[in-house]
């Protein structure tokens, strides 16, 4: 078979997938001839469709209907995508403006899933950074009153945790300043596990006049560090799944998405920063998600050998999703989140 014949059949497959994504209706040779510039006769298109069907790339749902893509057909379509739909300047500007409105890391990530759900019309998920690899960047101590402190713990990946501390005795501004210095000297640059150990050993060596205050602050900070789960997810847009043809298995799909382990496995399939993973139908390990497709990537810092992924984000939708547009939007949101975290 000539390479030109193979290329033409790929174009026929691409046209069938594109038409079905747009209409969710079986596609016939007449529709392909009318809507796409394939440059061949209806008989040639019918012959190509017969070959594609024999190869398992398309299927006929009913004897009198046109053809629909199979999961194998979607996979070949995705694997041969040469270009994804570029975002317009207005879309890029609107996305970045919305994300930059986040007040801290969690707010930025919450906005990212809301944005992804809105622009892709799919269910969106994002994984908060794994705190096992986080390090303390700074600990701020603010006196809210003479007997009440606000502790603000900031990690190197932008995570911010705030806790109030009720003191047993009055603390003056000079003591507050010293308390801040002691905590930062002990904690800055430490992993969260190391920080907990440092805090536990800190009190005995502290000046007597601030020891009670330091004990209260250290206890609160240790509780904060211990409370943090290693993986957390934020989800948005599950209602979008009710608008697509997933009604038969919708309850089990939503239940699977609410199982964090299932979603974390999906996000873990992305090898590194800058890559987008597409899992189609049966490629998903969870049985409940085998009529869906998952488009996922990672966000983090740096590029190349200096890259450090902090977590994953992506969308879950029907197998007939707009792959080109979805890949572009997932990639863009991850890139903008990474830029915001890097302070660019």
Curated annotation (Swiss-Prot):
A Pfam family it matches: HrcA
Signal peptide (UniProt feature, chain positions): none
GO molecular function: DNA binding; DNA-binding transcription factor activity
Keywords assigned by UniProt, alphabetized: Repressor, Stress response, Transcription, Transcription regulation
Single GO biological process annotation from the record: negative regulation of DNA-templated transcription
Family of the protein in this entry: Belongs to the HrcA family.
PANTHER family: HEAT-INDUCIBLE TRANSCRIPTION REPRESSOR HRCA
Function: Negative regulator of class I heat shock genes (grpE-dnaK-dnaJ and groELS operons). Prevents heat-shock induction of these operons.
This protein's name: Heat-inducible transcription repressor HrcA
Gene: hrcA
């Amino acid at each position: 078979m000539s390479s030109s014949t193979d290329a033409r059949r790929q174009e026929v497959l691409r046209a069938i997938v594109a038409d079905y994504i747009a209409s969710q209706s079986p596609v016939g040779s007449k529709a392909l001839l009318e809507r796409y510039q394939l440059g061949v006769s209806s008989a040639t298109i019918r012959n190509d469709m017969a070959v594609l069907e024999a190869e398992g790339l398309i299927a006929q749902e009913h004897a009198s209907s046109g053809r629909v893509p199979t999961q194998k057909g979607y996979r070949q379509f995705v694997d041969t995508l040469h270009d994804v739909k570029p975002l317009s300047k207005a879309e890029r500007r609107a996305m970045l403006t919305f994300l930059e409105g986040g007040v801290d890391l969690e707010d930025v990530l919450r906005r990212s899933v809301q944005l992804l759900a809105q622009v892709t019309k799919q269910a969106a998920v994002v994984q908060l950074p794994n705190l096992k690899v986080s390090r303390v960047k700074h600990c701020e101590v603010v006196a809210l009153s003479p007997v009440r402190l606000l502790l603000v713990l900031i990690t190197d990946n932008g995570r911010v945790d705030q806790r109030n501390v009720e003191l047993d005795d009055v603390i003056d501004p000079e003591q507050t300043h010293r308390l801040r210095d002691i905590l930062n000297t002990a904690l800055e640059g430490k992993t969260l596990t190391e920080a907990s150990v440092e805090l536990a050993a800190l009190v005995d060596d502290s000046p007597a006049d601030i020891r009670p205050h330091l004990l209260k602050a250290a206890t609160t900070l240790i509780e904060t560090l211990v409370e943090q789960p290693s993986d957390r997810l934020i989800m948005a847009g599950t209602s979008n799944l009710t608008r697509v043809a997933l009604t038969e298995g919708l309850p089990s799909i939503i239940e699977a998405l609410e199982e964090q382990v299932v979603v974390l496995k999906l996000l873990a399939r992305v090898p590194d920063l800058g890559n987008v993973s597409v899992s189609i139908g049966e490629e998903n390990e969870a049985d409940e998600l085998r009529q869906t497709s998952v488009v996922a990537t990672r966000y983090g810092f740096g590029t190349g050998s200096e890259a450090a992924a902090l977590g994953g984000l992506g969308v879950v939708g029907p197998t007939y999703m707009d792959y080109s547009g979805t890949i572009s939007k997932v990639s863009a949101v991850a890139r903008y989140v990474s830029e915001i975290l890097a302070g660019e």
